[in-house]
């Protein structure tokens, strides 16, 4: 059975934002603050390190009621028994991912505009990550910012919940939620925060109030 998931506050990891802090500690604090969906995004780790880190995170977040999805790497997700996989437009096709992971794991897909949101209709995915909403330096190949209006159009086209990503902060989170987003995907707003738990708690409150 596919796990229930709460996309209200979705942490996307970036060890480059941690200023030397331990990733598991930051993730644990963020989950304690209300991030109930976590994506492990590791572009530089070797496969063995990736699997070991993913396995440790599964053991950390699952007892706390959160879910872990793996960015891009279906093999890593299966090896560590993660809750799902998140893919981008240049990764494996969603139908192929679904065939590998089966019906009982989560599958997310990134979309960067209306055309991709429209093309995602009918795909076997559980949610879309839409953005960047605002200009971001976290992901160099993120594409042009779509703004609130672009987000609204992507949400209107979607058949599944849409999580907004791309320089979403406490200052603009309410507007993002008011646009109809199912949740906020955060990278630096939590990973780079001096107190990840407090940052997550503040963002969680804003997200829930913004619905």
Swiss-Prot record:
Listed GO molecular functions? magnesium ion binding; thiamine-phosphate diphosphorylase activity
Q: Report the EC code(s) recorded for this entry.
A: 2.5.1.3
| Annotated keywords | Magnesium, Metal-binding, Thiamine biosynthesis, Transferase
Task: Name the positions where Mg(2+) binds.
Answer: 72, 91
Cofactor: how bound: Binds 1 Mg(2+) ion per subunit.
Return one Gene Ontology term, BP aspect: thiamine diphosphate biosynthetic process
Binding, 4-amino-2-methyl-5-(diphosphooxymethyl)pyrimidine: 39-43, 71, 110, 139
Q: Pathway it acts in?
A: Cofactor biosynthesis; thiamine diphosphate biosynthesis; thiamine phosphate from 4-amino-2-methyl-5-diphosphomethylpyrimidine and 4-methyl-5-(2-phosphoethyl)-thiazole: step 1/1
Query: Is the Transferase keyword given for this protein?
Result: yes
> Mind naming one GO cellular-component term on file for this protein?
cytoplasm
Enzymatic reactions: 2-[(2R,5Z)-2-carboxy-4-methylthiazol-5(2H)-ylidene]ethyl phosphate + 4-amino-2-methyl-5-(diphosphooxymethyl)pyrimidine + 2 H(+) = thiamine phosphate + CO2 + diphosphate; 2-(2-carboxy-4-methylthiazol-5-yl)ethyl phosphate + 4-amino-2-methyl-5-(diphosphooxymethyl)pyrimidine + 2 H(+) = thiamine phosphate + CO2 + diphosphate; 4-methyl-5-(2-phosphooxyethyl)-thiazole + 4-amino-2-methyl-5-(diphosphooxymethyl)pyrimidine + H(+) = thiamine phosphate + diphosphate
What cofactor(s) does the depicted protein rely on? Answer: Mg(2+)
Q: Which SUPFAM superfamilies match?
A: Thiamin phosphate synthase
Sequence positions that bind 2-[(2R,5Z)-2-carboxy-4-methylthiazol-5(2H)-ylidene]ethyl phosphate: 136-138, 167, 187-188
Indicate yes or no for the key word GTP-binding: no
In the record, the note on similarity to other proteins reads:
Belongs to the thiamine-phosphate synthase family.
Protein role: Condenses 4-methyl-5-(beta-hydroxyethyl)thiazole monophosphate (THZ-P) and 2-methyl-4-amino-5-hydroxymethyl pyrimidine pyrophosphate (HMP-PP) to form thiamine monophosphate (TMP).
Recorded protein name is Thiamine-phosphate synthase
Higher taxonomy: Bacteria, Pseudomonadati, Thermodesulfobacteriota, Desulfovibrionia, Desulfovibrionales
